A protein has these predicted regions:
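Conserved PLP-binding catalytic core of the aspartate aminotransferase-like
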Residues: 140, 291, 303-336, 352
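N-terminal small-domain helix-loop-helix segment of the aminotransferase-like
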Residues: 2-94, 99, 376-377
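Short acidic capping loops at alpha-helix termini that bridge into adjacent secondary structure
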Residues: 33, 83-87, 108-111, 156, ...
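Active-site pre-lysine segment of PLP-dependent enzymes
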Residues: 127, 143-156, 168-233
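PLP-dependent aminotransferase class I/II
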Residues: 68, 225-309
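Conserved PLP-anchoring active-site segment centered on the Schiff-base-forming lysine
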Residues: 103-125
Length: 377
């Protein structure tokens, strides 16, 4: 008889918990229409150009993709004005996070450093790899104390993870502060890689031209000890195809291609990525939808008495007026066919995260929230 003898790190692991799907909510509550504002997906859906490309690419699905995804790497290199040798792609940026930890950190000897709370995949993958995670609390206003983060780094630290804009607050640290952190790490701990997760960076600022104010990648001067992570899941609308990419030091990128599982990016995902990079109108419409919706939702939520944290991302973190329960609000919204994200798993049981939707979705959410606040008063 077989005895399942998994490693202790796996046996004690809590699985990543995604938000409820539209199908789950429909089935549970018997609803015909459900609005999902929980997972920070693109409210405009799939690019029209991607739809066309995928419709004509299915006949090639029996073929393996080209090894190393050179066409996609070249396109991303042109987009970000970097050498193709620095570009890596993965089955979502999750794969790149996992690979970086496995390539750089030796179990039982090395550590990774991140904020708490943070994207849960950083500590989860570190734990799976048997690597210590050191966590720095966020400041009371959910900004970053980068000096406190740096204080957790020592000679055995191999990766420092920083998400900007941060999830779930939407906070962006000043670019100068990020540069200073990179220089501190390079000077004192040259074997430590600063991993900057810019999954939501496309939405930063009030207009498209403001990205260089916040982004190390967009600034055009990327420090040598920095890896940038990006994704096609958010502004590009390809969350279901699992496609992410990174800009790494060239030598490290070379090792990534040696260690990565072959063909982890499927051919349809690659074709979709190439297509959406060409669809400038879809990108413009997406960013306009998010930026205008972010302003409208912020205004509407504050008029309802909610605390709303300033956000540079495609979501807002809120706290209900005093006396109202976040969990009850979440359940009420579900019953009305609106999915948002409760933040109890982030250690914030009094807060909620709302993804920016279409104009119609945003107004529907505000109306249902208003009814909850009035009913519960």
């Amino acid at each position: 008889m077989y005895t399942c003898a998994v490693r202790p790190e796996i046996a004690s692991l809590s699985a990543y918990g995604p938000g409820m799907s539209i199908a789950e909510v429909r089935e549970r509550y018997g609803l015909s229409r459900v609005i999902k504002m929980a997972s920070n997906e693109n409210p405009l859906g799939v690019s029209p150009l991607v739809r066309k490309v995928l419709a004509t690419s299915l006949e090639e699905a029996f073929r393996y993709p080209q090894g190393g995804n050179p066409a996609l790497r070249e396109a991303l290199a042109r987009t970000h004005h970097v050498s193709p040798e620095r570009i890596v792609v993965g089955n979502g940026s999750d794969e790149i996070i996992d690979m970086l930890i496995r390539m750089l950190a030796v179990p039982g000897r090395h550590s990774v450093v991140c904020f708490e709370p943070c994207f849960s995949l950083y500590p989860i993958q570190a734990r799976i790899c048997g690597v210590e995670t050191r966590r720095c609390p966020l400041s009371p206003d959910y900004s970053f104390d980068l000096d406190a983060l740096f204080s957790l780094v020592d000679a055995g630290t191999r990766l420092v993870f920083v998400t900007t804009p941060d999830n779930p607050s939407g906070y962006c640290p000043p670019l100068a502060a990020m540069r200073r952190l990179a220089k501190q790490l390079e000077r004192h701990f040259p074997r430590c890689l600063l991993v900057v997760d810019e999954a939501y960076m496309d939405f930063a600022g009030a207009s498209c031209g403001e990205a260089p104010r916040f982004s190390l990648l967009a600034s055009g001067d990327l420090p040598a000890n920095v890896a940038i992570l990006r994704t096609f899941s958010k502004s590009y609308g390809l969350a279901g195809l699992r496609l992410g990419y990174g800009v790494l030091p060239a030598e490290l990128a070379g090792f990534y291609w040696r260690a990565r599982l072959p063909f982890s990016v499927n051919s349809l995902a690659e074709k979709a990525g190439l297509a959406v990079l060409r669809d400038s109108e879809f990108r413009r419409a997406t960013l306009e939808c998010i930026r205008s919706g972010r302003c409208r939702l912020t205004e509407g939520l504050r008029l309802l008495g909610c605390d709303v944290w300033p956000s540079e991302a495609n979501f807002l973190m809120i706290r209900l007026p005093e006396g109202y329960d976040a969990s009850s609000c979440f359940e009420h919204l579900l019953q009305c066919g609106i999915i948002i994200r409760p933040l109890s798993s982030y250690g914030m049981p009094d807060k909620l995260r709302i993804s920016i939707g279409t104009k119609e979705d945003n107004e529907a959410f505000l109306e249902v929230l208003r009814s909850f606040l009035e009913k519960s008063f």
